[in-house]
């Protein structure tokens, strides 16, 4: 991985500017955050700010100037997030969930009104950022990674890793309301006129980016946005773990992303297809009976078959369900072993010490034996029995 001196210089200059800008309150009250009021002490205490900051190819201010666009921005401990968050009226049935979430967040930001029935852009931004930070801790735990793992700077340098699970800079998320604006950003920044949700490896700063358009994905519901962001971040955090240097097995990464999304809210599902883009598939809230049927008919893809699938093109609708279930099984019954298995897989190095993604099927087979003490056939049997005993028939 190349990290040119000029890039480091640019990064540090921009960070210095950020610090200067943070000290100011926005002059106009209408631009002031309704959650933290841009209060420097409150922002500092909660390890967040509303920019400007370095982002994507340039920085948040330049993006707004170039595109004549006024999103809201937020930087937290592990993320930089920006975008449009249209006002959202909380549906009657969801009020309880949101009130509980807001009551919790009020402990950090006293100005929050937990009984509010409409979330403005600042509420939505702060709530999404909060959910993303919670997810970061959850993901790190699932990966079998200690919160202290990347805090030792000299150890990071020795291993050639950065502080963000192995990446050098924070994970980035961008949410556009309009498809056209999203396309314009994609063209300007990454040189691709894509409009589907996209993950991007920003090699200049060694960080992983994820973006989408609400209009394109027909996202109205706040939980649907939350789910699609968590799905994208599942991939990015997994990829970033011990540094993104080679591709992880597709069953593992897609299975994990589904597991995260479905654990958060099973009503909204995202499916990855080729080239890292995402698309929506059939709607089915409860996947468990469907997986049961596949096992009973002996039609579920086996571990032995799945470990060889190299691309999203080789994963059909039923495979998505099976991948999810296999992760559900491993994370629920063998969380510690799963973390060790995954950590070994992402940490592979060749004889010269370089990241090694070769012979991934052998590595997985050996990993199953070493960490779970199962051959792939044994793993298959264990999973099938567990799913039949655990999942409802209807
Ligand atoms: Zn705020």
Per-segment meaning from a language model:
Residues 55, 71, 75-245, 249, ...:
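Juxtacatalytic substrate-recognition/specificity segment
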Residues 68-73, 314-315:
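Short, surface-exposed beta-strand/loop micro-motifs that present aromatic residues
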Residues 27-67:
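Long, contiguous juxta-domain segments that are non-catalytic but functionally important
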Residues 1-5:
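Positively charged n-region of N-terminal signal peptides that target proteins for export
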Residues 19-23:
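Boundary at the C-terminal end of the N-terminal hydrophobic targeting segment
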């Amino acid at each position: 991985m190349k990290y040119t001196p000029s890039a480091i210089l640019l990064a540090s200059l921009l960070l210095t500017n950020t610090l200067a800008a943070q000290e100011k309150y926005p002059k106009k009250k209408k631009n002031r955050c309704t959650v933290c009021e841009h209060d420097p002490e409150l922002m500092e205490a909660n390890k967040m700010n509303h920019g400007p900051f370095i982002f994507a190819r340039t920085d948040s201010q330049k993006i707004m100037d170039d595109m004549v666009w006024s999103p809201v921005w937020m930087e937290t401990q592990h993320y930089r997030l920006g975008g449009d968050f249209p006002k959202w009226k909380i549906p009657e049935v969801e009020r309880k969930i949101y009130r509980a979430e807001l009551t919790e967040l009020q402990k950090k930001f006293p100005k929050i009104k937990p009984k509010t029935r409409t979330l403005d852009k600042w509420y939505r931004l702060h709530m999404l950022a909060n959910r993303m930070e919670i997810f970061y801790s959850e993901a790190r735990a699932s990966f079998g990674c200690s919160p202290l793992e990347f805090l030792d700077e000299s150890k990071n340098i020795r291993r050639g890793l950065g502080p963000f699970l192995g990446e050098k800079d924070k994970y980035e998320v961008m949410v556009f309301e309009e498809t056209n604006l999203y396309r314009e950003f994609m063209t300007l920044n990454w040189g691709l006129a894509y409009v589907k949700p996209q993950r991007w490896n920003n090699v200049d700063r060694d960080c992983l980016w994820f973006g989408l358009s609400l209009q394109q994905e027909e996202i109205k519901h706040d939980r649907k946005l939350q789910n699609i962001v968590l799905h994208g971040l599942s991939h990015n955090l997994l990829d970033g773990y011990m540094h993104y240097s080679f591709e992880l097995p597709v069953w593992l990464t897609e299975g994990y992303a589904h597991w995260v999304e479905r654990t958060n809210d099973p009503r909204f599902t995202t499916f990855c297809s080729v080239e890292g883009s995402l698309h929506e598939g059939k709607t089915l809230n409860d996947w468990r009976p469907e997986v049961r049927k596949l096992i009973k008919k002996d039609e579920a893809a086996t571990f032995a078959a799945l470990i060889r699938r190299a691309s999203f093109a080789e994963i059909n609708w039923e495979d998505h369900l099976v991948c999810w279930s296999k992760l559900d099984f491993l994370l629920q019954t063998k969380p510690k072993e799963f973390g060790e298995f995954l950590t070994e897989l992402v940490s592979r190095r060749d004889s010269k010490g370089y990241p090694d993604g070769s012979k991934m099927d052998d590595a997985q087979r050996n990993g199953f034996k070493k960490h779970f003490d199962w051959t792939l056939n044994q793993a298959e049997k264990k999973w099938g029995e567990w799913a039949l005993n655990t999942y409802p028939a209807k």
